[in-house]
């Protein structure tokens, strides 16, 4: 009986890995408009996604208790610093409810992109189909989701920066 239960657990685990692997670097099959939202950052400045139309937007969903999330903060910050002058916006959306949980990590990691407190709660996570943290969504200049990723990413990788360069170089659709 224990063997059957153990086998069942392994099958479920393997299925979850396949689902996550399928989401990793997944491109949207048909253009999907990114749901608009408005949230305040840690300094109280309001950000609306639609305000960034015409720019490539990388949204990173994370939390202070998520070790993998914290590991990717420096490479995400480097991506922002490298491309912000070319039309890239990075928005970090934390699931933490309190600024005090987040601010020390951001200071330590020297994060300079806006970090928003997810006041919309699970509704926003559902709209963006976020199933785990960290998760990253890339939105093109026209406001369409072009990539979704679950799990830690290396934003310094040539594969990712190549995609960002192609998106930045592409003309905005009318």
Positions of the model-derived regions?
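Bacterial N-terminal signal peptides
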Residues: 8-20
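N-terminal "domain-start" segment that seeds a small globular fold
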Residues: 23-49
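Conserved redox-active cysteine motifs that mediate thiol-disulfide chemistry
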Residues: 61-78
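Short pre-active-site segment immediately N-terminal to redox-active cysteine/selenocysteine motifs
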Residues: 55-57, 61-65, 132
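Short, internal strand/loop/helix patches
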Residues: 91, 103-142
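Positively charged n-region of N-terminal signal peptides that target proteins for export
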Residues: 1-6
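Thiol-/selenol-based redox modules, centered on thioredoxin-like
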Residues: 138-174
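Structural signature of beta-strand start/N-cap positions in the alpha/beta core
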Residues: 55-57, 89, 114
């Amino acid at each position: 009986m224990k063997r059957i239960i153990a086998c069942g657990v392994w099958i479920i685990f393997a299925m979850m890995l396949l689902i996550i692997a399928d989401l990793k670097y997944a491109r949207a099959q048909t253009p999907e408009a990114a749901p608009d939202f408005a949230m305040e950052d840690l300094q109280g400045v309001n950000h609306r996604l639609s305000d960034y139309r015409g720019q490539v937007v990388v949204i990173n969903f994370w939390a202070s208790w998520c070790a993998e999330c914290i590991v990717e903060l420096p490479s995400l910050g480097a991506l922002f610093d490298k491309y912000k002058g070319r039309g890239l916006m990075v928005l970090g959306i934390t699931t933490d409810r309190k600024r005090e949980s987040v601010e020390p990590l951001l200071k330590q990691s020297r994060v300079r992109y806006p970090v928003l407190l997810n006041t919309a709660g699970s509704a926003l996570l559902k709209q963006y189909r976020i199933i785990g943290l960290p998760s990253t969504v890339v939105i093109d200049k026209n406001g369409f989701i072009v990539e979704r990723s679950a799990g830690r990413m290396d934003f310094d990788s040539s594969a990712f920066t190549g995609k960002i360069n192609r998106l930045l170089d592409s003309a905005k659709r009318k």
